[in-house]
From Swiss-Prot:
EC number: 1.14.-.-
Catalysis: reaction(s): uridine(34) in tRNA + AH2 + O2 = 5-hydroxyuridine(34) in tRNA + A + H2O
UniProt KW Lipoprotein keyword: no
Active site positions, chain numbering: C177
Species of the source: Vibrio parahaemolyticus serotype O3:K6 (strain RIMD 2210633)
Keywords associated with the record: Oxidoreductase, tRNA processing
Name of the protein described by the UniProt record: tRNA uridine(34) hydroxylase
Amino acid sequence: MSQYVVCALYKFVELNNYQELREPLLALMEKHHIRGTLLLAGEGINGTVASDRAGIDTLLEWLNTEPRLTGTVYKESYSETQPFNRTKVKLKKEIVTLGVEGIDPRHVVGTYVKPQDWNDLIADPEVFVVDTRNDYEIEIGTFKGAVNPNTETFREFPDYVKENMDPAKHKKVAMFCTGGIRCEKSTAYMKEQGFEEVYHLEGGILKYLEEVPQEESMWEGDCYVFDGRVAVNHQLEKADYDLCNACRLPITDEDKQSELFEQGVSCPKCHGKHSEEQVERFREREKQVSLANQRGEQHVGGESAKQRAQRREAKLAKKAAQRKQA
């Protein structure tokens, strides 16, 4: 059994006081050695974190003690190593950024399709299948016959729809993403634009890979994930990709053989795109990482997680004492 449980989670729900959830959530994560990033916004929670089994269970139990976060959707996979360096809880305007005002998956959303029924849907010639993810994700793998919208960020997806899709022409649309959250927003947007039959893969690609046997699968390639594993194969095991620390894009062993590759500084995808100042900064960072590795330490910058946890627990205790005195 792998040592670390990787948990991707989200829930669209009204969180008027989401700012107040940050400190207790961060303190809990640091106390239980949970790394990764969670996003909080007025529309809900989203993120991916990793810890041992006990740590993840503690987090899920905490979420269930907050009535609005009960029933948070989550999916688990496993990693031999801790795939995150830091623990973060960020406050955002959106938990997944589409950049279009008024899109609310709690009120209108596409039709969910179970992984077991997905093959039949996308094999239908009348169904227009769209991968809502970004170029660098699709390059690694996608479903057979799916259209690549050629977007660099999710914010560009509405423009793709406006320029390339028509409710009168595309009567049936099927969409998918890594874990399901982007499709919550994209299908809600499509419905608002007048598309009537809009479907999306429930649980996303990760759930499909988990539940559909590889011999029956219509998935081709590997699946990009937003953690240190970079990508997973059909068995949800780490695939043969690394991350360029300069541009944060996935790279292969072949990329690392290129004369344009310099560890931590550039790869064939980003060589020549950074300023001299950035390149020097990347080289200095790589030097510090190397020195930290030689000392048997982990270079993540700033104070340690233990120090941050102690400081936050003291801050929460002080606030609790002040409330009792009030």
